[in-house]
Amino acid sequence: RANGKKSLIPAFCDLLNIKYTGSDAFVISLLRNKYVYTKFLEENGITVPRSELFSDKSDLHLLLSQYKDQYVIVKNRYESASIGMTDKNVFRLCQNSLQHLNNLLKEMCTDSLLVQEYIDGIECEVLVLQYKGKYYALDPVQILFKTNLNFIDTDTSNTYNYEFKVIESSIKFLLQATAQKAAELLGVKDYARFDFRIKKGVPYLFDIAGTPYTIYHSSISYLFTQY
């Protein structure tokens, strides 16, 4: 669960002058650190969920000043594919939440958690491609959940218990523009996937996959069956 582990392959390829697809070691490392890229994008005008870090040395009162009596989602700041996520990771933050947060630290085998405001809205994914120096955002694909758990936890991810639908409404243009701008800001090479939650017509960028799945159960695979 160390930061930067997915940068080893591009770093190795660069060292030996081997051609590869995807972003370089720096960008891949950046895209694995949810807190850092979230704050960077926020400073550059991208709408993101409010986000803070929590460790066993954190002061709960600082979190309460931001999120008291609000629902939050708690993630491992470095992991992907919803690793370690369960229904325990979305809850209302209150005075009694300290023990729950400490339990999540242990259960998720990490020393630092990302605490974000929970955006209760539809979830979608946008693939951005880079070609000859320009970025192109493809059609957004909505995640259709099959259970009452309205986010992808580990079990949902492992069993592919969801479906897809291409978003056709006018919000697609804002999603595409936002994903494209984020890719440009981050210096993405070749491709990346940008994940959003939409609430009251506002898309919140909450996750990025620098090496997204393209296998049959992925939104990317589904999207290319629709063209």
Regions found by a protein language model. Give the residues of each.
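A short, GP-enriched loop/loop-strand-helix hinge that lies immediately N-terminal to
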Residues: 1-32, 47-50
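ATP-dependent carboxylate activation and anion-phosphoryl transfer catalytic cores
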Residues: 42-45, 169-227
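Active-site nucleotide/adenylate-binding loops and adjacent lid/helix of ATP-dependent enzymes
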Residues: 28-114
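Phosphate-binding site of ATP-dependent enzymes
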Residues: 94-170, 174-177, 198-204
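Short small-residue beta-strand/loop micro-motif enriched in glycine and branched aliphatics
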Residues: 22-23, 81-83, 162-163, 215-220
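Short beta-strand or tight-loop elements
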Residues: 70, 111, 122-124, 189-192
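Short, flexible, mixed-charge acidic loops at enzyme active sites
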Residues: 6-10, 150-157, 210
